[in-house]
Amino acid sequence: MVTIEMENGKRIEIELSGSAPNTAANFKSLVSKGYYDGLIFHRVISGFMIQGGCPRGTGTGGPGYSIKGEFKAGGVDNPISHERGVISMARSSDPDSAGSQFFIVHADAKFLDGQYAAFGRVVSGMETVDEIAAVNTDSSDRPKTPQVMKKVTLSEDEEVTEPEKVK
């Protein structure tokens, strides 16, 4: 279980899936190192998704490496559908370009199935996702009021391993 504690004290709890094991390992590894602490949800589109995990806060940064895309177009059978509450990895047009940026689906987006590595779902705190999705944004979908992830933590029973990196 991963808990995202927002700056306002509200929480989002995410249960990770075994359907994208390297993607989940990557996320847990970054969480265990405090990578996401203090980062923002830099791209928010109500009725679609909220995206965070960029160290620059712009959507252009990452951890300095990428992982293989664990989804059908990347040659991996991943049965998780991009339904409301699912967490998935953001990437560029390169299927193997995911690093640290992730998104939480705000409303069903099944057109993403097979193209992005879904690796878990929100089990508590969808009202917090809804609140983030409702904030005012600029023309680049950036919240006018920063939506800060104060601390992102793993439950004690989560095993952490380093992910397999491709670049």
Give the residues covered by each predicted segment.
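Cyclophilin-like peptidyl-prolyl cis-trans isomerases
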Residues: 1-167
